Amino acid sequence: MQFKDHPKQYKPKVYLIQEIPGTNKGEPKYNIVGAQKYGEIVTMLPEFSQMIHSPGPLIYKLRTLLKNYTSEDYLLLSGDPAIIGVVCSIVADTTNGRYKLLKWDRQEKTYYPIEINIYQK
């Protein structure tokens, strides 16, 4: 899997790792509409997905879902912490350790982009 840079007309995506709790009941626990200003929201996994004893099939599925991830895209970290860790690992592996995520600020009630470079000293 190769990391891709897209031309300027590319519309970024916000990869929501897991559906927001309560989505299945039609009552999401929190609203992520504010993340749309950073790109189209792409939901990767259903609300109740879990990492199990044999994570191989889930890792394969996540790699497939992230195959078009680019330097312009963002991760929106929601869901099972083990799955979040795997997603960040996959993205870091394909982007030479550089990726962006959205951080919710409770006081300002807005998302802030954070650029991660795991090799930065």
Residues covered by each model-derived region:
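Long, low-complexity, Lys/Arg-enriched
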Residues: 1-74, 86-121
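Short, surface-exposed polybasic-aromatic patches that bind anionic ligands, especially phosphate groups
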Residues: 77
